[in-house]
């Protein structure tokens, strides 16, 4: 499961001591799951980042270079491989990449 939070400062969660943010669900995920303390993206825009996560490719390979660019025809996402292996997959939220 991936939970993506756009435009989210690295420290804007209560478990990191933010004085105003109240994030009990993220706090629970961090204490019972994984919290990456040193993570980054190669392109700080929504769509290119999503395309990289879902394809495993850098932006110059998948060509989603901004938030208005569609994913090129024939682009394969890793959930498609999971589906071929018999897994049920799902997506909730914004997409921004056409199709």
Regions found by a protein language model. Give the residues of each.
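Formylglycine-dependent sulfatase
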Residues: 1-99
């Amino acid at each position: 499961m991936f939970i993506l939070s756009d435009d989210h400062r690295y420290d804007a969660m209560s478990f990191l001591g933010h004085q105003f943010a109240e994030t009990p669900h993220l706090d629970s995920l961090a204490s019972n799951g994984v919290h990456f303390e040193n993570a980054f993206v190669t392109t700080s825009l929504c769509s290119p980042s999503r395309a990289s996560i879902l394809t495993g490719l850098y932006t110059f390979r998948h060509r989603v270079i901004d938030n208005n660019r569609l994913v090129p025809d024939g682009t394969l996402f890793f959930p498609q491989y999971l589906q071929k292996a018999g897994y049920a997959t799902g997506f909730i939220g914004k997409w921004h990449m056409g199709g």
